[in-house]
Design a protein with these regions (language model features):
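Short, flexible, solvent-exposed loop/turn segments with mixed acidic/basic and small polar residues
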Residues: 74-87
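Amphipathic interfacial helices
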Residues: 86-95
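Helix N-cap motif at beta-to-alpha junctions
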Residues: 97-102
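C-terminal motif of bacterial Sec signal peptides marking the signal peptidase cleavage site
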Residues: 15-17
Length: 227
């Protein structure tokens, strides 16, 4: 029933556009408000599970992050979906392990405990032609999914700016990664923005994809520091 309702509203939004807010858009807004409210309700549970997982593997978990109404609406338009179809209105990241080969153990633990609590929704492994890879476990609540990403220390370092990396994993781990790899944090995002830019030529895209692959290769598996 909700699926049919969603399709009708989606067509209305796509056809009329955001500039013509009629009754259909008001219904879309109502669903958005409800989905965002549920994300706030389910967020603390999601964060607690992420922290439990992080503690099991001597890692850390980021504070729960909620999509803004504006960001959620843009994603609905980009993905041609409705608010309840979004799986990351509330999301957090578990940062654990130094070797990418060990991520599977973290994911398996996360799947096990969410299954025991009847909250497991789906597992997705992401890959790309520019070196990025990631693992996502979605929790399924009554009518909305939330998201827990799983990353190694190196992959987290690759994707986020220095301030956030230091705040999340601590200065000691940050300095260790930099001393071992010699690369700056957050460059994966810089390369990605250039790769996806409409103004980038094919040669530019190919060049930065190669830089990105090399960058991720360096950070994929880092020797565990001596305790």
């Amino acid at each position: 029933m909700r699926k049919a309702y969603s399709v009708i509203l989606l067509l209305a939004v796509v056809v009329t556009g955001c500039s013509q807010r009629g009754p259909e858009q008001s219904l879309f807004d109502q669903q958005m408000d409800c989905a965002l409210a549920l994300a706030q309700e389910y967020g603390p549970i999601t964060e607690a599970i992420a922290r439990q997982t992080a503690e099991e593997f001597d890692g850390v978990a980021t504070e729960i992050n909620y999509k803004s109404p504006e960001s959620a609406e843009r994603k609905c338009q980009t993905d041609s979906c409705m608010p309840f179809d979004l799986k990351d209105l509330a999301r957090t990241t578990v940062v654990a392990t130094w070797d990418s080969a060990a991520v599977g153990e973290v994911v398996e633990f996360l799947i096990t405990i969410t299954t025991e609590q009847e909250l497991f929704g789906r597992y997705k492994h992401q890959t790309s032609d520019y070196g990025y890879w990631g693992d996502i476990v979605n929790l399924q609540f009554d009518s909305l999914m939330t998201e827990i990403q799983v990353k190694t220390y190196g992959m987290f370092y690759a994707a986020d700016p220095e301030e956030m990396v230091r705040e999340t994993i601590g200065d000691e781990r940050y300095e260790y990664i930099y001393s071992v790899t010699g690369v700056e944090p957050g460059m994966a995002h810089v390369y990605y923005e250039i790769i996806r830019a409409d103004t980038s030529s094919e040669a530019t895209i190919a060049h930065y994809k190669q830089l990105s692959r090399e960058y991720f290769r360096i950070l994929q598996s880092i020797p565990k520091p001596d305790e």
